[in-house]
Amino acid sequence: MSFFQCIGRSALFMLDPEHAHNLAILWLKSGLNSHKRIVDKRLSVRVAGLKFENFMGLAAGFDKNAEVVDAVFRLGFGFTEVGTVTPKPQAGNAKPRLFRLKEDEAIINRMGFNNDGHQIVHDRLQGRKKSDIVGVNIGANKDTLNRIGDYVAGITCFYDVADYFTVNISSPNTPGLRDLQARDNLRLLIKEISQARSENKKKHGFSIPIFLKLAPDLTEQELDDVAAELSLSDFDGLVVSNTTLFRQGLKKSAFMNEGGGLSGRPLFERSTIVLAKMRQKLGKDIAIIGVGGVWDAQTALEKIKAGADLVQFYSGMVYEGPDLAKNITKDVLQMMQQDGVDTIKAYRDHHVEKWAKFELHL
C-alpha cells in the first residue's frame, strides 16, 4: 500500500471533497511532485494524427481551468484534457455539489461547468510551451441563448492552443444539454462545428482533431443515431463515456441518491459496453477514448480490448492516489512482457464482441 493509501487518503477524505480537490491543485502548482513519466515506445500510439507518448490521459474535470497542465504530465500521463470550458466564466451549481461514495469507490458530481471562461483559460494555455498533448473540452453556458454558438466559439477561441477538442454534450448537470445528442440536434451541431474548424483551418493552416463525448445512458437506437451522424461527418472520434444518472447496484451510502453524474468503479461496466457497441457500429478507423471506472492496469487494458485507442481516468486517482498513472504504466508493461506484445495497440478490439453483446438496461 502506498503512502497515499495509508495516510494521505484518510487525511484528504476528512475534508469536503471540493476542498480536497482544490488542495490537490495547489499541491501540483507547488511543484513538489517530482515524478518523471515512464517513456517506453511500446506504450506510444498515434491517434487522429497525433502521437501520444502513452495511451493514458487525465480526464476532463480535474484541471478545469488549465492551472496545472505541465504538472499533470509529471504524474505519468501521456495527455491531459482541460475543461469543461464555457465562453463566459460561471460559478456552477450551488454547493454541496461533489460527493464521495466510499463504499462503492465512486463519486457523484453536479458541478455545473464551473470554470474561468474561454479567455482566461486560453491565456493560461498560450503561456506554456506546447509540447505534450493537451485537449480542450468545450461546453455551453447554462444561461446561453445559443448552445451551438457556444461550441463554435470554443473552437475558434482555442484553435491556436489545443491539440484536440472534445465537444461535451453529455454532462447531466446542465439542464437540456444532453438533448444535443438527439439526431436532428446532433446533425446541426456537427455541421456548425465542422464549419468552424474549416474556417479556422484556413486561417491557421492546420486542422485540429475533434471528439464527441457521449453519455452512457443512451438507448441502442440512440447509439445507432449517433453512429449514423458521425459516419457522415468529418469528426475524428468519440470519448466514451461521461458520467451516468443510473444508481443500480450501489451499496448503501448516505449520498447515493444525490443528484448528478456518477463516476468511479460502478461506471466501468456500462461505459465499457457502450464503448464496444460504438466500436462495432463505427468500424475500426474512427478514434475512441475510453473513460469510466479505470482503476488499474487490468481495467485500462480492458478498455483497449473493448475498442478504445486511448484511455482516460480521474475518479480512480481520487481513491488510488497520484501514483496511479505511473503504477498502471509499470503493470501494463509487465503484462505486455508476459503476453509477448510489442505495442499497446495490439490489444485493441480483442473483447469487442464480448462487451457489445450485453443489453443496455435503462
Swiss-Prot record:
Family, similarity comment? Belongs to the dihydroorotate dehydrogenase family. Type 2 subfamily.
* Record's bilayer topology term: Peripheral membrane protein
What is its EC class? oxidoreductase
- The UniProt entry annotates the active site at S171 (nucleophile)
Q: Name one GO molecular function term.
A: dihydroorotate dehydrogenase (quinone) activity
Q: How does it assemble?
A: Monomer.
Cofactor binding, note field: Binds 1 FMN per subunit.
Alphabetical keyword list: Cell membrane, Flavoprotein, FMN, Membrane, Oxidoreductase, Pyrimidine biosynthesis
PROSITE patterns referenced in this protein's UniProt entry, alphabetically: DHODEHASE_1 (PS00911), DHODEHASE_2 (PS00912)
EC annotation from Swiss-Prot or TrEMBL: 1.3.5.2
Pathway noted in the entry: Pyrimidine metabolism; UMP biosynthesis via de novo pathway; orotate from (S)-dihydroorotate (quinone route): step 1/1
Q: Which reaction does it catalyse?
A: (S)-dihydroorotate + a quinone = orotate + a quinol
Supply the Gene3D superfamilies for this chain.
Answer: Aldolase class I
Q: Record-annotated residues binding FMN? A: A60, G61, F62, D63, K64, T84, N137, N168, K213, S241, G264, G293, Y314, S315
Protein species of origin? Bartonella bacilliformis (strain ATCC 35685 / KC583 / Herrer 020/F12,63)
Pfam families, per this entry? DHO_dh
Tell me the CDD domains matching this sequence.
Answer: DHOD_2_like
Chain's role: Catalyzes the conversion of dihydroorotate to orotate with quinone as electron acceptor.
InterPro entries according to UniProt: Aldolase_TIM (IPR013785), DHO_dehydrogenase (IPR050074), Dihydroorotate_DH_2 (IPR005719), Dihydroorotate_DH_cat (IPR005720), Dihydroorotate_DH_CS (IPR001295)
Q: Name one GO cellular component term.
A: cytoplasm
Q: What is this protein called?
A: Dihydroorotate dehydrogenase (quinone)
**Flavoprotein: present as a keyword of the record?**
yes
One BP annotation, GO: 'de novo' pyrimidine nucleobase biosynthetic process
- Where on this chain does substrate bind? K64, N109, R110, M111, G112, F113, N168, N173, N242, T243
What top-level branch of life does the organism fall under? Bacteria
